[in-house]
Amino acid sequence: MNNQKGLSVKSVVAIGIGAAIYVILARFTSIPTGIPNTNIEIVYPFLALLATIYGPVVGFSVGFIGHALSDFLMYGQTWWSWVLATAVLGLIIGLYGMRLDLENGVFTTKQMIGFNIVQIIANVVSWLIIAPVGDILIYSEPQNKVFLQGATATITNSISILILGTILLKAYAATKVKKGSLRRD
């Protein structure tokens, strides 16, 4: 009987390595949008991959730790409302990822569509609700500014995950042996 409590070693390692890679990707792959402090982020497809493979706790943790560290290293301060939004994005995608069977090489067109519906909803919750409302409540930022940033982030992050995230998940599933695909000769 396994009464193990807490995170597995595999999850802890995924969080540590994932957060480190998050910081590197956030630092070197951000593409400015022209909206202040809002970029096209290549890091979110990576977060979606980790959250889908390892689950909601890893997705939340990598998003939270990675975003907090990258904000601090790049700007000298951390925008906690956006850190929480990133963590929630990882959490929601990770919850949906539990329904997928990537480990057995399965990522069907129907699952791709479901994944993308969920990630778009997660982006809306994160960037159109959590981040701007947090900016208003915590930092007293102007509403029109933060909702413009949130709308831009929602669109760019949704597209980024739709394209790159789907490709990463399909490629990951393709590396796994499909259940029942091996036959004895």
Swiss-Prot record:
Q: Where in the cell is it found?
A: Cell membrane
Q: Looking at the record's lineage, which domain of life comes first?
A: Bacteria
Q: Which Gene3D superfamilies match?
A: 1.10.1760.20
- UniProt cross-references to InterPro entries, sorted A to Z: ECF_substrate-spec-like, UPF0397
UniProt KW keywords: Cell membrane, Membrane, Transmembrane, Transmembrane helix
The membrane topology noted for this protein in its Swiss-Prot or TrEMBL record is: Multi-pass membrane protein
One Pfam family matching this protein: ECF-ribofla_trS
**GO CC: one term?**
plasma membrane
Q: Which residues cross the membrane?
A: 6-26, 46-66, 78-98, 113-133, 147-167
Q: Which family does the similarity line name?
A: Belongs to the UPF0397 family.
What's the protein name?
UPF0397 protein LJ_1703
Give the organism's phylogenetic lineage.
Answer: Bacteria, Bacillati, Bacillota, Bacilli, Lactobacillales
